[in-house]
């Protein structure tokens, strides 16, 4: 199947080049003379450690893909033509973007990921970001919330409010968005295993504000597959986790048509050490898996498909990243059209958010990270992202200070309003280097798709450890190259200095006690009988097999309505997750040999 969906004909390797006579003459004369007089600079530090078997410098991308000295028409397929391989923005195959006017019509959304300590403190940060021009909000939750534990659970000790905001109940969500009209903004929530619970809280807060669910918009990350692949913040086994995701697809297509019910995330796969190609391939194949599970439920692809969104990383290798984004749109279009037979054009569009690479930030000389983030953000923009988060320079050390967060937002604004890159669409389109890299990304992704198809899909591949092994090997090879100084990390393995530790944000250790006291008061004041009733109803629904009804209405076993009722009764995140654990059990990863 995968091979049939490639761009015809399958792209040629660099070994199949047929240079023109002028290129041959240039190689034999101008280039040859230049190399004789001045050899190319070595790669690596300090005198060149990245050499091939002939002692020549080996130029590669960060992912290790070879980079030629020069790209010409000879690096493209012999039948390469503009209409077949590129097309126009806003038209298939969307290589050049999904909007006909690019950023001239609308700039990307500047969506800064933020959340720390208490809901009260994060609420103030959100108001600051909105006041400084942020176009949307992106919620970072703390580790206990991500893992489905309340702040007063023993497992939560030492982690409450550390890497995001602590949300235990609807009361916390009400505080988080106090004074912020949810119908007037878009919100992205980075939450996965407990995603349906936090989304239910968001919907109830919107309801209490008088908002129409059909008019609110935002994005729920809700990508459990990448938890097994990379981030490891899973709760339930894969099958019931997938069932919960499809419940949100079904519910969202009926009641929240403007809300993206998933953000299929390559970001964390890249942060775990994958190459750019692996990020692209595994992310899109995760999307394939979600679509297939939804279709088996009986959902209509043209109902839930338009609400599928993606989330990619922006790493340091400028052109490799741009090629990745361009290839992603092209691949998704072809898959939705030819593999899943989506009829509506909007179902075939890939919309994606991008975040600059947290893993690239260095604790040493942290101000250097401002430059790294700017380069990464520019790549995301030139690749056509719909929204963007720029990391703060101090995030290798702690959650960002208010000043660092403001600089990261200003970085986007300078790119948008001062650089001129938003004035024309896909300005790197037609570059022989970029087009060759885009084709290579596409071809490499389909190679991975064939392997994953053979393994029986992503869930089966995860259980067999295939993608985990691929990521682990790529991570090892990258770290080996850094330690061998084949790859230079400025300020880490080259150009180092002694420096004073910077000012960083510290989280008040009393946050756990405050959240625990709030929980005690909540449990004393709510109707605990109502909490028990709603949780029992949820467990009964979770134990049933959901199927779409003949009239198209949602299944009686869809868990979302039951979770919403539990949230309205002020059941906590931990209580709802524990109810589902009683039905589904907890997942324990086996070691991958």
Language-model regions: role of each:
Residues 2-315, 320-321, 339-342, 346-353, ...:
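Catalytic alpha/beta active-site cores
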Residues 4, 18, 22, 28, ...:
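Flexible, glycine-rich loop/tail regions that form catalytic "lids" or insertion modules at the edges
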Residues 89, 117-124, 167-171, 193-200, ...:
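Conserved active-site and cofactor/substrate-binding residues in soluble primary-metabolism enzymes
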Residues 106, 152-155, 183, 225-227, ...:
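Short acidic (Asp/Glu) and glycine-rich catalytic loops that position anionic groups and cofactors
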Residues 116, 125-132, 170-180, 201-205, ...:
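Generic, well-ordered alpha-helical scaffold segments in large soluble proteins
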Residues 154, 198-205, 227-231, 245, ...:
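Short alpha-helical interface elements
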Residues 158-162, 187, 226-236, 269-275, ...:
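Short beta-alpha connecting loops at secondary-structure transitions
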Residues 259, 300-304, 342-356, 364-393, ...:
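Flexible glycine/proline-rich, aromatic-decorated loop/lid segments
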């Amino acid at each position: 199947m995968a091979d049939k969906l490639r761009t015809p004909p399958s792209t040629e390797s660099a070994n199949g080049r047929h240079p023109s006579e002028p290129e041959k003459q240039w190689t034999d004369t101008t280039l040859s003379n230049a190399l004789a007089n001045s050899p190319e600079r070595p790669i690596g530090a300090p005198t060149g450690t990245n050499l091939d078997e002939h002692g020549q410098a080996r130029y590669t991308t960060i992912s290790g893909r070879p980079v030629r000295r020069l790209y010409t028409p000879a690096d493209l397929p012999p039948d390469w033509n503009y209409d077949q391989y590129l097309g126009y923005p806003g038209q298939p195959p969307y290589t050049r973007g999904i909007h006909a006017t690019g950023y001239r019509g609308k700039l990307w959304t500047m969506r800064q990921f933020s959340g720390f300590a208490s809901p009260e403190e994060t609420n103030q940060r959100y108001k600051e970001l909105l006041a400084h021009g942020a176009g949307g909000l992106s919620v970072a939750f703390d580790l206990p919330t991500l893992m489905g534990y309340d702040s007063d659970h023993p497992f939560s000790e030492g982690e409450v409010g550390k890497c995001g905001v602590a949300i235990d109940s609807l009361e916390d969500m009400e505080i988080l968005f106090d004074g912020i009209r949810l119908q007037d903004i878009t919100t992205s929530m980075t939450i996965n295993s407990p995603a349906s619970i936090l989304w239910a809280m968001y919907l109830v807060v919107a309801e209490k504000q008088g908002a129409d669910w059909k008019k609110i918009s935002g994005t729920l990350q809700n990508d459990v597959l990448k938890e097994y692949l990379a981030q490891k913040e899973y709760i339930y086994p894969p099958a019931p986790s997938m069932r919960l995701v499809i419940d949100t697809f079904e519910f969202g297509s009926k009641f929240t048509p403007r809300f993206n019910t998933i953000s299929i995330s390559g970001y964390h796969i890249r942060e775990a050490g994958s190459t750019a190609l692996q990020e692209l391939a595994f992310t899109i194949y995760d999307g394939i898996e979600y679509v297939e599970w939804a279709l088996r439920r009986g959902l209509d692809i043209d109902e839930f498909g338009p609400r599928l969104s993606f989330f990619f990383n922006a790493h340091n290798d400028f052109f490799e990243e741009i090629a990745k984004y361009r290839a992603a749109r092209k691949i998704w279009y072809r898959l939705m059209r030819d593999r899943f037979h989506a009829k509506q054009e909007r179902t075939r569009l890939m919309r994606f958010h991008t975040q600059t690479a947290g893993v690239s930030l260095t604790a040493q000389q942290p101000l250097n990270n401002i430059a790294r983030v700017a380069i990464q953000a520019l790549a995301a923009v030139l690749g056509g992202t719909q929204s963007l988060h720029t990391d703060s320079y101090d995030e290798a050390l702690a959650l960002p200070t208010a000043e660092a967060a403001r600089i990261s937002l200003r970085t986007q604004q300078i790119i948008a309003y001062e650089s001129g890159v938003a004035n024309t669409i896909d300005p790197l389109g037609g570059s022989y280097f970029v087009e060759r890299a885009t084709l290579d990304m596409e071809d490499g992704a389909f190679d991975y798709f064939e392997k994953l198809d053979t393994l029986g899909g992503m869930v089966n591949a995860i259980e067999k450890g295939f993608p985990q092994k691929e990521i682990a090997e790529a991570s090892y090879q990258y770290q080996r190259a850094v330690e061998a100084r084949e790859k230079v990390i400025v300020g880490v393995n080259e150009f180092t200095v002694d420096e004073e530790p910077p000012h960083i944000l510290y989280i008040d250790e009393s946050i756990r006690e405050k959240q625990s006291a709030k929980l005690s008061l909540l449990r004393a004041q709510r109707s605990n009988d109502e909490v028990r009733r709603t949780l029992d109803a949820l467990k009964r629904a979770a134990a049933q097999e959901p199927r779409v009804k003949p009239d198209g209405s949602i299944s009686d076993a869809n868990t979302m309505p039951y979770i919403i009722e539990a949230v309205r009764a002020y059941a906590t995140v931990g209580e709802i997750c524990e109810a589902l654990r009683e039905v589904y059990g907890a997942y324990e990863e086996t070691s991958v040999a």
